[in-house]
Protein backbone atom coordinates (compact mmCIF):
# COMPACT_ATOMS: atom_id res chain seq x y z
CA UNK A 1 0.00 0.00 0.00
CA UNK A 2 1.34 3.44 -0.94
CA UNK A 3 0.34 6.92 0.10
CA UNK A 4 1.87 10.16 -1.20
CA UNK A 5 1.76 11.56 2.32
CA UNK A 6 3.45 8.66 4.09
CA UNK A 7 5.12 6.56 1.38
CA UNK A 8 4.90 2.78 1.67
CA UNK A 9 2.70 1.86 4.62
CA UNK A 10 2.17 -1.87 4.12
CA UNK A 11 3.99 -4.55 2.15
CA UNK A 12 2.42 -8.01 1.90
CA UNK A 13 4.67 -11.00 1.25
CA UNK A 14 2.88 -13.89 -0.42
CA UNK A 15 5.80 -16.34 -0.25
CA UNK A 16 5.00 -19.59 1.55
CA UNK A 17 8.62 -20.02 2.63
CA UNK A 18 10.48 -17.02 4.00
CA UNK A 19 14.17 -16.78 4.87
CA UNK A 20 14.69 -14.55 7.92
CA UNK A 21 17.99 -13.13 6.62
CA UNK A 22 16.35 -12.11 3.35
CA UNK A 23 13.35 -10.75 5.25
CA UNK A 24 15.56 -8.55 7.47
CA UNK A 25 17.40 -7.26 4.38
CA UNK A 26 14.07 -6.49 2.69
CA UNK A 27 12.91 -4.56 5.74
CA UNK A 28 16.14 -2.55 5.68
CA UNK A 29 15.81 -1.87 1.94
CA UNK A 30 12.25 -0.65 2.33
CA UNK A 31 13.40 1.62 5.16
CA UNK A 32 15.89 3.23 2.78
CA UNK A 33 13.23 3.71 0.10
CA UNK A 34 10.63 4.91 2.57
CA UNK A 35 12.79 7.33 4.52
CA UNK A 36 11.72 7.85 8.11
CA UNK A 37 8.27 6.33 7.77
CA UNK A 38 7.47 2.92 9.21
CA UNK A 39 6.39 0.23 6.76
CA UNK A 40 4.49 -2.77 8.10
CA UNK A 41 5.26 -6.10 6.44
CA UNK A 42 2.57 -8.77 6.54
CA UNK A 43 3.36 -12.39 5.82
CA UNK A 44 1.25 -15.01 4.05
CA UNK A 45 -0.99 -16.94 6.43
CA UNK A 46 0.59 -20.22 7.42
CA UNK A 47 3.90 -19.42 5.72
CA UNK A 48 7.10 -20.96 7.07
CA UNK A 49 9.84 -18.66 8.35
CA UNK A 50 13.30 -20.25 8.30
CA UNK A 51 15.49 -18.54 10.87
CA UNK A 52 18.96 -19.02 12.31
CA UNK A 53 19.14 -19.05 16.11
CA UNK A 54 21.34 -15.93 16.00
CA UNK A 55 18.59 -13.99 14.15
CA UNK A 56 15.81 -14.45 16.69
CA UNK A 57 16.38 -11.15 18.54
CA UNK A 58 16.41 -9.19 15.26
CA UNK A 59 13.22 -10.70 13.85
CA UNK A 60 11.37 -10.40 17.17
CA UNK A 61 12.66 -6.83 17.47
CA UNK A 62 11.11 -6.00 14.09
CA UNK A 63 7.89 -7.69 15.22
CA UNK A 64 7.59 -6.02 18.63
CA UNK A 65 9.03 -2.65 17.68
CA UNK A 66 11.96 -2.87 20.09
CA UNK A 67 14.32 -2.12 17.17
CA UNK A 68 14.46 1.50 15.98
CA UNK A 69 11.72 2.21 13.46
CA UNK A 70 8.84 0.68 15.39
CA UNK A 71 6.93 -2.51 14.73
CA UNK A 72 7.54 -3.40 11.10
CA UNK A 73 6.57 -7.04 10.88
CA UNK A 74 3.48 -9.02 11.79
CA UNK A 75 4.01 -12.66 12.74
CA UNK A 76 0.71 -14.26 13.69
CA UNK A 77 0.07 -17.76 12.35
CA UNK A 78 3.31 -18.54 10.56
CA UNK A 79 5.36 -21.66 11.26
CA UNK A 80 8.90 -20.97 12.44
CA UNK A 81 11.79 -23.38 11.77
CA UNK A 82 15.00 -22.59 13.65
CA UNK A 83 18.48 -23.72 12.60
CA UNK A 84 20.80 -24.09 15.60
CA UNK A 85 20.08 -24.58 19.28
CA UNK A 86 17.96 -22.10 21.22
CA UNK A 87 17.24 -21.48 24.89
CA UNK A 88 13.92 -22.21 26.53
CA UNK A 89 13.44 -18.44 26.86
CA UNK A 90 13.84 -17.93 23.09
CA UNK A 91 11.51 -20.87 22.41
CA UNK A 92 8.86 -19.24 24.61
CA UNK A 93 9.30 -15.87 22.87
CA UNK A 94 8.89 -17.45 19.43
CA UNK A 95 5.91 -19.48 20.55
CA UNK A 96 4.24 -16.40 22.02
CA UNK A 97 4.45 -14.54 18.71
CA UNK A 98 2.70 -17.15 16.53
CA UNK A 99 -0.10 -19.66 16.63
CA UNK A 100 1.89 -21.69 14.10
CA UNK A 101 4.31 -24.46 15.00
CA UNK A 102 7.82 -23.67 16.20
CA UNK A 103 10.35 -26.35 15.23
CA UNK A 104 13.66 -26.03 17.07
CA UNK A 105 16.35 -27.82 19.04
CA UNK A 106 16.59 -26.73 22.66
CA UNK A 107 20.11 -26.12 24.00
CA UNK A 108 21.26 -29.37 25.62
CA UNK A 109 22.48 -27.61 28.77
CA UNK A 110 18.96 -26.50 29.74
CA UNK A 111 17.93 -28.10 33.04
CA UNK A 112 14.79 -30.11 33.65
CA UNK A 113 13.56 -27.22 35.80
CA UNK A 114 13.99 -24.82 32.87
CA UNK A 115 12.53 -27.26 30.32
CA UNK A 116 9.34 -27.49 32.38
CA UNK A 117 8.80 -23.75 31.78
CA UNK A 118 8.18 -24.25 28.05
CA UNK A 119 4.82 -22.57 27.64
CA UNK A 120 3.14 -24.39 24.75
CA UNK A 121 2.34 -28.00 23.94
CA UNK A 122 2.03 -28.06 20.14
CA UNK A 123 5.58 -27.16 19.09
CA UNK A 124 8.18 -29.60 17.79
CA UNK A 125 11.11 -29.09 20.15
CA UNK A 126 14.02 -31.52 19.98
CA UNK A 127 15.01 -31.99 23.62
CA UNK A 128 17.99 -33.88 25.02
CA UNK A 129 18.03 -34.34 28.80
CA UNK A 130 21.38 -33.14 30.16
CA UNK A 131 23.71 -35.46 32.09
CA UNK A 132 23.45 -32.88 34.90
CA UNK A 133 19.88 -34.20 35.30
CA UNK A 134 20.84 -37.89 35.31
CA UNK A 135 18.63 -38.34 38.38
CA UNK A 136 15.11 -37.36 37.40
CA UNK A 137 11.52 -37.89 38.41
CA UNK A 138 9.00 -39.60 36.18
CA UNK A 139 6.63 -36.69 36.82
CA UNK A 140 9.16 -34.14 35.50
CA UNK A 141 10.04 -36.16 32.40
CA UNK A 142 6.35 -36.66 31.61
CA UNK A 143 5.73 -32.93 32.08
CA UNK A 144 8.48 -32.13 29.55
CA UNK A 145 7.08 -34.78 27.20
CA UNK A 146 3.83 -32.82 27.24
CA UNK A 147 5.66 -29.66 26.06
CA UNK A 148 6.71 -31.00 22.64
CA UNK A 149 5.40 -33.11 19.79
CA UNK A 150 8.92 -34.42 19.15
CA UNK A 151 10.57 -37.30 21.01
CA UNK A 152 12.75 -36.50 24.04
CA UNK A 153 16.19 -38.12 24.26
CA UNK A 154 16.65 -39.39 27.83
CA UNK A 155 19.90 -41.30 27.21
CA UNK A 156 21.69 -39.42 30.02
CA UNK A 157 19.08 -40.34 32.65
CA UNK A 158 20.39 -43.05 34.96
CA UNK A 159 17.88 -42.92 37.82
CA UNK A 160 14.12 -42.31 37.86
CA UNK A 161 11.83 -41.94 40.85
CA UNK A 162 8.11 -41.50 41.28
CA UNK A 163 4.88 -43.25 42.11
CA UNK A 164 4.11 -46.53 40.40
CA UNK A 165 1.55 -44.82 38.15
CA UNK A 166 3.97 -42.00 37.21
CA UNK A 167 6.79 -44.41 36.34
CA UNK A 168 4.45 -46.72 34.42
CA UNK A 169 3.02 -43.81 32.42
CA UNK A 170 6.52 -42.59 31.56
CA UNK A 171 7.71 -45.97 30.30
CA UNK A 172 4.51 -46.49 28.31
CA UNK A 173 4.89 -43.10 26.61
CA UNK A 174 6.27 -43.00 23.07
CA UNK A 175 7.42 -39.42 23.64
CA UNK A 176 10.49 -40.22 25.76
CA UNK A 177 13.18 -42.29 24.07
CA UNK A 178 16.24 -44.24 25.23
CA UNK A 179 14.84 -45.43 28.54
CA UNK A 180 15.22 -48.97 29.84
CA UNK A 181 18.43 -49.27 31.84
CA UNK A 182 17.77 -46.84 34.71
CA UNK A 183 17.63 -47.41 38.45
CA UNK A 184 13.97 -47.02 39.41
CA UNK A 185 12.67 -45.92 42.79
CA UNK A 186 8.93 -46.30 43.45
CA UNK A 187 7.69 -43.95 46.17
CA UNK A 188 4.32 -45.50 46.97
CA UNK A 189 3.56 -48.86 48.52
CA UNK A 190 2.95 -51.72 46.11
CA UNK A 191 0.73 -54.69 46.84
CA UNK A 192 1.22 -58.15 45.43
Which residue stretches match the model-derived regions?
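Solvent-exposed, low-complexity segments and loops of surface/extracellular structural proteins
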Residues: 1-192
Amino acid sequence: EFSNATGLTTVALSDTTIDATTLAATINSIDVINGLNTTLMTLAAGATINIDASEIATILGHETGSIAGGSRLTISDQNIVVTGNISVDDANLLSATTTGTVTASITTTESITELKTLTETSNAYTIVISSADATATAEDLSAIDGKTTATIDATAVTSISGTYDEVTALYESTGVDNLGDEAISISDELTV
